[in-house]
């Protein structure tokens, strides 16, 4: 099973990351469609040695793998934590999914590059990242009671560059990342997420704050 192969390779910290399809679990006749809205963000910890929560699903903010009828299957794996490369975030690991990951540096790095006002290790940069007109923008100036102004994010070009399967980036505590996921068969599909690494224990776990753009 491709999902099992994916998990085993992630567990062994391999270099290559084969793609895996999402498991389709038949619904019982009395099951009703979920009425909860799509989750827009949250905090999630991925554990290197946990077969379920080593991946994250951006649709509901839950663990990407599942035990189904005594089988280990992929449920919805949009982001993975692997020990490869001394600890990496990996995306574009499902069947037909492609991705790009861009490391924006720390909150202080963004403040320095884009010259907006923010506290030391503050949240202005992360909070202000947004999608506008097919590009990512960041705060330029907050005029208080007047309308804030925005500026293009220079790294947006890298985000919208050609995506690839199993895109990866080294994990850095306190760094902000942008992840863009596309589908090689469904050209209309696109998912863009911003991440902040808020805790990291190498070889064990990484905790991220994430939010859909």
Placement of each model-derived feature along the sequence:
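Positively charged n-region of N-terminal signal peptides that target proteins for export
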Residues: 1-4
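Hydrophobic helical h-region of N-terminal Sec-dependent signal peptides
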Residues: 6-14
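C-terminal segment of classical bacterial N-terminal signal peptides
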Residues: 13-22
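Surface-exposed, beta-sheet-biased, low-hydrophobicity segments with strongly acidic/polar composition
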Residues: 24-213
């Amino acid at each position: 099973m491709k999902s099992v192969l994916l998990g085993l390779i992630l567990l062994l910290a391999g270099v290559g990351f084969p793609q895996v399809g999402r498991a389709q679990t038949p619904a019982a006749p009395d099951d009703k469609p979920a009425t909860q809205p799509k989750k827009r963000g949250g905090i999630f910890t991925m554990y290197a040695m946990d077969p379920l929560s080593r991946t994250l699903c951006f649709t509901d903010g839950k663990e990407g793998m599942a035990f189904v009828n005594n089988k280990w299957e992929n449920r919805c794996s949009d982001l993975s934590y692997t020990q490869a490369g001394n600890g990496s975030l990996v995306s574009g690991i499902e069947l037909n999914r492609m991705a790009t990951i861009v490391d924006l540096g720390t909150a202080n790095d963004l403040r320095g590059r884009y010259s907006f006002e923010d506290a030391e290790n503050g949240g202005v940069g992360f909070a202000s990242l947004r999608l506008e007109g097919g590009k990512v923008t960041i705060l330029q100036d907050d005029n208080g009671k007047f309308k804030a102004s925005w500026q293009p994010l220079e790294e947006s070009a890298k985000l919208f560059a050609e995506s690839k399967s199993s895109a990866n980036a080294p994990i850095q505590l306190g760094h902000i990342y942008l992840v863009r996921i596309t589908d090689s068969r469904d050209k209309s599909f696109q998912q863009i997420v911003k991440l902040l690494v808020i805790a990291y224990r190498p070889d064990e776990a990484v905790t991220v704050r994430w939010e859909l753009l």
